[in-house]
Amino acid sequence: MAEPQPASSGLTDEAALSCCSDPDPSTKDFLLQQTMLRIKDPKKSLDFYTRVLGLTLLQKLDFPSMKFSLYFLAYEDKNDIPKDKTERTAWAFSRKATLELTHNWGTEDDETQSYHNGNSDPRGFGHIGIAVPDVYEACKRFEELGVKFVKKPDDGKMKGLAFVQDPDGYWIEILNPNKMATII
């Protein structure tokens, strides 16, 4: 195991690698399938994630006895979504990098209801990231759509990437993967 590093410096590359194990062969078909965000108002969130960010609603699942709904979104062609419910469910759960939005019924009508985005104390969850071909063009469009920015592309020390907020205040990093090496 690597030597502990002072909190101010983080792990060295070597120390980080020494903390990692080679994946067990039994995990070769595992994939990161989804991340989940709790949402207050599905109408606002679905509009934001589809119209603003361009995701496609893959499937909606309702759980009446527990009073919540799940919405699964991803960057997929809506024409590829199977029509048969059983087939669609298996297909939706086999996609990579799916965003699951969880709506607990009634939260949209509760003015005191809000979710913690993890970027203020107590810190925890930080953000999701969306890769785009051109950060500046994407942000120009977001501005025209009235999207709330946490960081515009030329703000701060890390130029060329941005952070926007969804209707619940969750942060979304907007990045161009081909430019990240020059930013970090």
UniProtKB/Swiss-Prot annotation:
Residues found modified as S-glutathionyl cysteine: 139
Annotated Gene Ontology cellular component terms: cytosol; nucleoplasm; plasma membrane
GO MF annotations in UniProt: lactoylglutathione lyase activity; zinc ion binding
Residues the record lists as binding substrate: 34, 38, 104, 123, 127, 157-158
Pfam hit, one: Glyoxalase
EC number: 4.4.1.5
InterPro entries referenced in this protein's UniProt entry, alphabetically: Glyas_Bleomycin-R_OHBP_Dase (IPR029068), Glyas_Fos-R_dOase_dom (IPR004360), Glyoxalase_1 (IPR004361), Glyoxalase_1_CS (IPR018146), VOC (IPR037523)
Cofactor(s) this protein cannot do without: Zn(2+)
Domain VOC, first and last residues per copy: 31-177
Modified residues (N6-succinyllysine): 148
Disulphides: 19-20
Active site positions: 173
Modified residues (N-acetylalanine): 2
Binding positions for Zn(2+) per the UniProt entry: 34, 100, 127, 173
PTM comment: Glutathionylation at Cys-139 inhibits enzyme activity.
Residue ranges crossing the lipid bilayer per the database entry: none
Modified residues (Phosphothreonine): 107
Residues annotated with N6-acetyllysine modification: 148
Pathway of action: Secondary metabolite metabolism; methylglyoxal degradation; (R)-lactate from methylglyoxal: step 1/2
Keywords: Acetylation, Disulfide bond, Glutathionylation, Lyase, Metal-binding, Phosphoprotein, Zinc
Gene Ontology BP terms: glutathione metabolic process; methylglyoxal metabolic process; negative regulation of apoptotic process; osteoclast differentiation; regulation of transcription by RNA polymerase II
Family: Belongs to the glyoxalase I family.
Self-association state and partner proteins as the record states: Homodimer.
Role summary: Catalyzes the conversion of hemimercaptal, formed from methylglyoxal and glutathione, to S-lactoylglutathione. Involved in the regulation of TNF-induced transcriptional activity of NF-kappa-B. Required for normal osteoclastogenesis.
PANTHER family reported in the protein's UniProt record: LACTOYLGLUTATHIONE LYASE, LACTOYLGLUTATHIONE LYASE GLYOXALASE I
Protein name: Lactoylglutathione lyase
Organism of provenance: Rattus norvegicus (Rat)
Classification lineage: Eukaryota, Metazoa, Chordata, Craniata, Vertebrata
